[in-house]
A protein has these predicted regions:
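Bulky hydrophobic/aromatic "packing anchor" residues in well-ordered structure
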Residues: 36, 55, 275, 450-452, ...
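Short, solvent-exposed turn/loop segments enriched in Gly/Ser/Thr/Pro and often Arg
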Residues: 156-159, 209-213, 429-434, 497-503
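Core catalytic loop region at the nicotinamide-binding pocket of NAD(P)H-dependent oxidoreductases
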Residues: 492-510
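Short, internal active-site loops enriched in acidic
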Residues: 125-127, 212-214, 279-282, 432-435, ...
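Substrate-gating cap/lid region and adjacent catalytic-acid/histidine neighborhood
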Residues: 233, 241-242, 277, 281-469, ...
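Non-catalytic accessory segments of hydrolases
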Residues: 2-179, 203, 365, 460-478, ...
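Serine-hydrolase-like catalytic core of hydrolytic proteins
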Residues: 75-76, 83-273, 289, 308-344, ...
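Short glycine-biased active-site loop of nucleotidyltransferases that positions the nucleotide triphosphate
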Residues: 142-143, 223-227, 439-444, 501-502
């Protein structure tokens, strides 16, 4: 691995550590810190990402660009209560964010320059509200040492990235609004397609991979005609395109945008001009307030079925087979939702309110009400299937039920749809938990697989966890599977346990076990979400 930073010129060296992309409707980066796109100084706010303004000479790309606009705590607000469960006081590093944020970074191994290396493009998680491609957890050095180029990127978040409004729809030549964050991701993929060969990468062999919101976005892009031929494979860690709830059309989301303009004091006929002049943080604060009151149940930070970026809901696209025909590696962690439960408890405690302790019946009802709009009769079947366990074990069993209906069922459905489209799917479950005071309460929580995939155990984000040599051993295995898949579409390789491709009759999957071993198993999906192919397509078509 060469550890030099590149500037904006044709590279003379075959080894480049990091690279560019651009600014919120600009893109820069760290390979060369090259503006990939321009987007968010206010005249460009809520518009498609634009090519960067030209410049002469060498553009310094040795430092990372700003994160996109977000809460100053960033992903630290997610990590802090998890560390507290392990008895560690986690220090949140404030995030420096800006609307001038569309940058990408790349790690290129010290291989012959004309090698045509596979490319892995990472979409960070954070509920499409926080995070960036420059998080220490996503350092691509270890993955790139396996003979791949790793690219990470920023995209617009929250109200800057996912905001629909009638005036925006009217000014768009595509009569569309709401998917600016997705457009940034597509712009980054287009940059990779056009430029990565200059750095020894193969533009025809790109794997899009992500975690949580990044995983959801990656699978959503499978349903977008704008991403056609921009990637060949997808790795989806803990996030499914099917988890978006009722179809979110532009018409469904525009009333929230109008309410934001009204709350900002804008005149009805010129809300957009007012909103474009306000500080981004103020617009976000107004929207968050409305979500907490007038628009409860809305998720303002997810993709919109706009007729252009997304002609139909991702679930419908999967059901009809109108998706990008790519190979898929997908899975989830054994106790994804323990992290959100612990985070909610910490937030409630911090607010000064007494801890809410709903009765078991109320917990079950809350679970059913929260999941039924997303998954229809899967919810009722899950409640029936888990009722006895929930009565006996309480919250841990509810954690498991939530994990299955929001995680396992959608992953199995995606694998089935990809397989029916003639491609290969490989499914996993990550069960390894880190020994320590928080283990019993958290288990293999949401995002825990990230340091294993990137081999970033030592970075600040995860430094509070007492990892052992077993964890490092498992990381080496997972790195190999992930990069093998990126190279050929088959994760298997010498010395690795056989990971069988998905078959609907046996549902094979690989467990990254508590002991740190990779163990092949079968029958991935819970019994309540076993549907015939026709029934599954019907259920997805109704989402």
């Amino acid at each position: 691995m060469c550890a030099i930073a590149f500037r904006l010129q044709q590279p003379n060296s075959p080894c480049i550590e990091r690279a560019i992309a651009g600014n919120s409707t600009e893109w820069h980066g760290r390979l060369p810190r090259n503006p990939l796109r321009r987007a968010s100084r206010w005249p460009l706010r809520w518009r498609e990402p634009q090519p960067p303004a030209p410049w002469t000479g060498v553009r310094d790309a040795t430092k990372p660009g700003s994160a996109c606009v977000q809460n100053e705590a960033g992903v630290g607000s997610f990590i802090k209560p998890l560390a507290a469960a392990y008895g560690v006081a986690y220090n949140i590093v404030p995030v420096s964010s800006s609307e001038d944020c569309l940058f990408l970074n790349a790690w290129v191994p010290d291989w012959p320059h004309q090698s045509q290396l596979p490319v892995m493009v990472w979409l960070h998680g954070g509920s499409n509200r926080v995070g960036s491609g420059t998080e220490d957890a996503y350092d691509g050095t270890a993955l790139a040492s396996h003979g791949v180029i790793v690219v990470t990127l920023n995209y617009r978040l929250g109200v800057m990235g996912f905001f629909a409004h009638p005036e925006l729809t009217a000014e768009s030549p595509h009569h569309s609004s709401g998917n600016y964050g997705l457009l940034d991701q597509i712009a980054a993929l287009q940059w990779v397609r056009q430029n990565i060969a200059q750095f020894g990468g193969d533009p025809a062999n790109v794997t899009l991979f992500g975690e949580s919101a990044g995983s959801i976005d990656a699978t959503v892009l499978m349903a977008s005609p704008l991403s056609q031929n921009l990637f060949r494979r997808v790795i989806a860690e803990s996030g499914s395109a099917f988890g978006l709830g009722p179809e979110r059309s532009v018409a469904y989301m525009e009333p929230l945008g109008v309410a934001v303009g009204k709350a900002a004091g804008a005149q009805p006929e010129s809300q957009l001009a007012t909103l474009r002049k306000l500080p981004a943080a103020q617009v976000a604060q107004i929207e968050n307030s409305l979500i907490a009151t007038q628009f409860k149940g809305y998720d303002p930070n997810a993709s919109v079925v706009d007729g252009w970026v997304l002609p139909q809901s991702p679930a419908k696209a999967f059901a009809s087979g109108t998706i990008e025909k790519v190979d898929l590696l997908a899975g989830l962690n054994a106790r994804e939702f323990s992290a959100f439960r612990v985070g909610a408890e910490a937030a409630q405690k911090q607010s000064g309110q007494p801890p809410a302790k709903p009765g078991l019946g109320q917990q079950i009802a809350q679970f059913a009400d929260a999941t039924r709009p997303l998954y229809g009769n899967w919810t009722d079947l899950a409640v029936a299937d888990y009722m006895g366990k929930i009565i006996v074990h309480g919250t841990p069993a509810l954690d498991q039920a939530t994990n299955d209906i929001l995680g396992a069922c959608p992953v199995g459905a995606e694998a089935a749809m990809v397989t029916s489209a003639g491609r290969h799917a490989f499914v996993y479950r990550f069960e390894r938990s880190v020994p320590g005071p928080g283990e019993s309460n958290l288990g293999a929580f949401h995002a825990l697989e990230i340091p294993y995939v990137f081999n970033t155990f030592q970075v600040h984000t995860f430094s509070w966890l007492p990892f052992t040599p077993t964890d490092h051993k498992l990381s080496a295995v997972m790195e190999s599977y992930w990069t093998n898949f990126a190279k050929s579409g088959d994760p298997n390789g010498p010395g690795l346990p056989l990971w069988s491709a998905w078959r609907t009759d046996k549902e094979p999957f690989l467990v990254y076990s508590e002991s740190g071993d990779a163990i092949p198993k079968e029958n991935f999906s819970p019994s309540f979400c076993h549907l015939s192919p026709d029934r599954l397509k019907q259920q997805l078509a109704n989402m």
